[in-house]
Amino acid sequence: MTKFDHHFDYVKISLASPSKIRSWGERTLPNGQIVGEVTKPETINYRTLKPEMDGLFCERIFGPVKDWECHCGKYKRFRYKGVVCERCGVEVTESKVRRHRMAYIELAAPVTHVWYLKGTTSYIALALDLTVKDLEKIVYFHSYVVINPGNYHKLNYKQLLEGYEWRNLEEKLSSHSSNIFGIEVGIGAEAIYKLLDNINLQNTVEILREESLRPPKLFKNPSTKFNKKMKRLRLLENFLATGANPSWMVLSVIPVIPPDLRPMVQLDGGRFATADLNEFYRRIINRNNRLARLKAILAPEIIIRNEKRMLQEAVDSLMDNGRRGRTVIGANNRPLKSLSDIIEGKQGRFRQNLLGKRVDYSGRSVIVVGPNLKLHQCGLPKEMALELFQPFVIHRLILQGLVNNIKAAKKIIQRNEVVVWTVLQEVIYGHPVLLNRAPTLHRLGIQAFEPILVEGRAIKLHPLVCPAFNADFDGDQMAVHVPLSLEAQAEARLLMLAPHNFLSPATGQPILMPSQDMVLGCYYLTTYNPAAISDSSHYFSNLDDALMAYQQNNITLHSLVWVRFSGLVNDSSNQMVISSKLNIDGTITKIFSDRIVKYDNDGQMVVQYIRTTAGRILFNKAIRESLL
């Protein structure tokens, strides 16, 4: 790993100037020679299988292919470390420098950066206050643009001219009687470069700030023009704040990434497989060299212009293949991967390699429903648990004196001896694990559970925590992480355990709510059969007797029965007495719709029967047991 001499607080991404890009790749050799510019499209010599000098894999620019050995073989071994071969100019050093040494291509004509030209917001168009359509006409050589109108009153600054309009104007300018002078008209990225370079950031920002103080009268619905001015003001202020020049959005130097990040490998049949980026760089160098040659021989303007357009398209495809124009495809009709394709998306450099690193003590498997689990539990497959907790198991085996060393412990683990599962059960007791389902969109996307060993290879998940994870059981996968330190375990238990996260952080509403089959089951258990209302002639002395009658099939789950109940009944909604009866012993029996109550002479309740079903008794019993 590279060690930095200087500490830093943050990384800032900003526009790079042409001199900055050159400084990334330029190095001065001890003999005073400056290397870093790639001028040849060749990669390797197919006869010697060595990189071509000044090519895309040049050892003089990027460093040696073999450790401590120069290109020509004059210097070999570590003792020549730091020596630069006077014959081939290669520095004797480690080959891993080819992973970070860069180079550059000096362009014969400037080109625009496609990200700033054709992005979601075209920053070049915004900076110049032009439409994207007009900008593309200029860049791709369809229209001319006025850079300086001179003293000709019919021309305006940044006005677009078609080819025939410019030819007519040229005829006027070339005539001897013409008194028009100072006109400057351009086309292509060179014209855009001049327009961007002409922007006086300080003055333009001050003018836009004054205009921002006088917004349109309909302030609630500002015009599109006003919004665009505000966006332009923000952009130019950012240029001022970062010290960047808008003209840097037009490239005159292309950086070349290190060769080991775009490798070329030999296959079994003698053929070579190469990274797609090499093809893009090769096209750019070929077109660039051809353009330089055409300029040198003073070729006609139309030919040079066509070559500039082709160079622009080659650079566009390197930056973002297919963003504009025809997609460059490889030998097997597959679109070549550009720099944007390598960086962006789920499989890109950021999400796949930088944010999505593999970590130890973690696993992944399909989830299945575990309705018999407690809310704070999850079912962990035995094989996975043994692999995740292996260091803990080995430590416990040695502590208990069952083995003497780690090697012996690993052997009995491989043999799946019974003692291993006993020790594993002891190890996981009280040790929470973290379950995570991607994408983790809020803090409830990762929660802690106590693991329960289960057979099979699927992780069992309590159905009530599914809404928090946005999980379902149609093939979803979840990751398991083991908190190792005592601090991490305590945090998982106190803050991240599933029962501690039953409110949604977004709304404050409960997120652990029964749904679907649970609601249907509760409804089915507590409903009654309307047809059996007239046949509710069964009386039971207590709740257990009613359940026993249900188990012996004397009553159904939904049959209405009368059960003696001594507890408090909250039935304020139905207090209307249907009938009242005076008994021989002086007691009074009052019959309500769902209760029969017997009172003594003093008005005290003697006995109470409630009308219910076996299903409701079961439901009440389950809730009561869970609360106790």
Curated annotation (Swiss-Prot):
Binds 1 Mg(2+) ion per subunit. Its EC number is 2.7.7.6. GO terms for cellular component: chloroplast; DNA-directed RNA polymerase complex; mitochondrion. In plastids the minimal PEP RNA polymerase catalytic core is composed of four subunits: alpha, beta, beta', and beta''. When a (nuclear-encoded) sigma factor is associated with the core the holoenzyme is formed, which can initiate transcription. Zn(2+) binds at residues 70, 72, 85, 88. Transmembrane segments: none annotated. Its main location: plastid. Mg(2+) binds at residues 472, 474, 476. Keywords: Chloroplast, DNA-directed RNA polymerase, Magnesium, Metal-binding, Nucleotidyltransferase, Plastid, Transcription, Transferase, Zinc. One of its GO terms (molecular function) is zinc ion binding. Belongs to the RNA polymerase beta' chain family. RpoC1 subfamily. InterPro entries: DNA-dir_RpoC1_gamma, DNA-dir_RpoC_beta_prime, RNA_pol_asu, RNA_pol_N, RNA_pol_Rpb1_1, RNA_pol_Rpb1_3, RNA_pol_Rpb1_3_sf, RNA_pol_Rpb1_clamp_domain. This is DNA-directed RNA polymerase subunit beta'. It catalyses: RNA(n) + a ribonucleoside 5'-triphosphate = RNA(n+1) + diphosphate. GO terms for biological process: DNA-templated transcription. Its cofactor is Mg(2+); Zn(2+). It is found in: Plastid, Chloroplast. DNA-dependent RNA polymerase catalyzes the transcription of DNA into RNA using the four ribonucleoside triphosphates as substrates.
